[in-house]
Regions:
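Hydrophobic alpha-helical transmembrane segments
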Residues: 69-73, 120-125, 138, 142, ...
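Specific aromatic-rich, kink-prone transmembrane helix
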Residues: 97-115
Length: 190
């Protein structure tokens, strides 16, 4: 059990990365070194590509060919982020690297909640999962979602297409979007 050296009080340390490595070791019959290699290299690589794909898909906002092309080409653009990965990897910050590579997945899930409220449980679990791997990624998700709301959803709220107009209707739609995202984030963080 981790504890503070000076006060002897217990410390919180997220165990998501280590639990993933232990599960790999048990279920895939890997040695500890092999499990660490998979957890520290493959997990961030795959989740970074998925994060880029999900964020591109959300930014394009379409399900057709344009969305598919954006989601397919976004991981190629992530290759430029490779130096950041090596800094994290060679300093031994493997949980941090894994959590930061999952940020786009959690942010994209939270961004879809105002359009599809039935995604609240999945988005909350995704947000909680990123925090379980390493809590340093939670503010990054919050900043991405807040900027998305301020720069896009504030001007184009979710229920705008329904035809009803008016100041109070617009305020209600924006408040509803913030409430749905906030409830999801709180449920994931609790």
């Amino acid at each position: 059990e981790l504890q503070n050296i000076e006060t002897q009080k217990p410390l919180f340390y997220p165990t998501g990365f280590h639990t993933f490595g232990a599960a790999l070791q048990d279920y895939a019959a890997l040695t500890p070194v092999e499990a660490l290699n998979v957890a520290s290299v493959v997990l961030p690589a795959v989740s970074l590509a998925l994060s880029a794909a999900f964020l591109a898909w959300v930014m394009v906002g379409r399900r057709g060919l344009t969305g598919a092309l954006a989601a397919g080409l976004a991981p190629v653009a992530v290759v430029g982020v490779i130096p950041v990965f090596y800094v994290e990897y060679y300093t031994g910050a493997w949980p941090n690297a894994s959590a930061l590579s999952m940020v786009g997945i959690a942010a994209a899930a939270l961004m879809k909640v105002p359009e599809r409220p039935k995604m609240i449980p999945a988005a909350a679990l995704g947000f909680a999962g990123v925090g379980a791997v390493h809590p340093s990624a939670i503010p990054v998700v919050a900043v991405i979602v807040a900027l998305w709301w301020l720069l896009w959803k504030l001007f184009v709220p979710t229920g705008r297409e329904q035809g009803k107009r008016g100041f109070f209707r617009g305020v209600w739609l924006r408040c509803k979007d913030v409430l749905l995202i906030g409830v999801t984030a709180i449920a994931g963080g609790a």
